[in-house]
Amino acid sequence: MSTATSAVTVLGAGSYGTALAICLARNGHQVTLWGRNSDDVATLAAERKNQRYLPDIPFPDTLTLEADLQRAAASNEIVLVVVPSHAFGDTLKQIKPALQQGAKVAWATKGLEPNTGRLLQEVAVQELGDAIPLAVLSGPTFAKEMAMGSPTAISVSSTSTEFAQQLADLLHCGRSFRVYNNDDFIGIQLGGAVKNVIAIGAGISDGVGFGANARTALITRGLAELTRLGCALGAKPETFMGMAGLGDLILTCTDNQSRNRRFGLALGKGESVEAAIESIGQVVEGFRNTKEVYLLAQRSGVEMPITEQIYKVLYENKDMKEAAMALLGREQRSE
């Protein structure tokens, strides 16, 4: 942890945004946490904890709540956006007039732009311009464990090496939180989106009862799909062997804390898409991500058979066992 204290605004008071705000405040930094619903924000401020998502973890004294988006964005030079991917562009559009001179914007949102499949970096440049330093945080992190202070490691990448190091210093804690700098801005973003899709597939596989062999094959070939797409877009293949690639993929595909995996499990056990989403009770990024990753792969001319079959299950009502047979029945080829 850096000995210097800073001030940071976190936009998004869901489980992950709250957890990041707690980690930053626990490191001694002044943190402003914004939430979309003013009544919910008032409750958070009164109870000094997020009873819905992280009920056993009190807020540090240096964490304050704010219900006004522009006021939150204007309050600190560093702004960390942790909203769902479908709200990302609109959130940036709203905060742009309020940002301080010299502001820096990072995000921990994992996904792609809805309906276009664009990287969030492209959305950020469109909404904020290319003069503002931008950064992304990604890696194998469940909010509850992170907020509890369990050992955690993530990656950070930025258009500015100085900003990347600043974020690493803000979050790093020798007891529990390690941050790795990575100069592959594209790869770090992409890993956080594609792993959601593969996690749904792993959940479906387990829900249907295919077993550990099938799950492991999905994870391994899913990593190959991620790497192919990433390289086609200019990412470095070694990025996908790190925290934001293999690390996040394993975590999301194998642990039932993952909403995307639980969503897939529910589908595999016979629930409809709508019922499965409702049963999760939180945003299931992978549902939208599947369509966006599929569009991006088609636009890039990259073969992603697992993603294609999951897309057909979710959006074309394809039978899950038929989708599995379509993968197994593909032409034999070298690994």
From Swiss-Prot:
Which chemical reaction does it catalyze? Answer: sn-glycerol 3-phosphate + NAD(+) = dihydroxyacetone phosphate + NADH + H(+); sn-glycerol 3-phosphate + NADP(+) = dihydroxyacetone phosphate + NADPH + H(+)
Its pathway is: Membrane lipid metabolism; glycerophospholipid metabolism
- Which positions form S-S bridges? none
User: What's the EC number here?
Assistant: 1.1.1.94
Report keywords, A-Z. Cytoplasm, Lipid biosynthesis, Lipid metabolism, NAD, NADP, Nucleotide-binding, Oxidoreductase, Phospholipid biosynthesis, Phospholipid metabolism
Which positions are catalytic residues? Answer: K195
One GO biological process this protein is involved in is:
glycerol-3-phosphate biosynthetic process
Q: What does this protein do?
A: Catalyzes the reduction of the glycolytic intermediate dihydroxyacetone phosphate (DHAP) to sn-glycerol 3-phosphate (G3P), the key precursor for phospholipid synthesis.
Q: What is the official name of this protein in its record?
A: Glycerol-3-phosphate dehydrogenase [NAD(P)+]
This chain's source organism reads Pseudoalteromonas translucida (strain TAC 125)
Q: Gene encoding this polypeptide?
A: gpsA
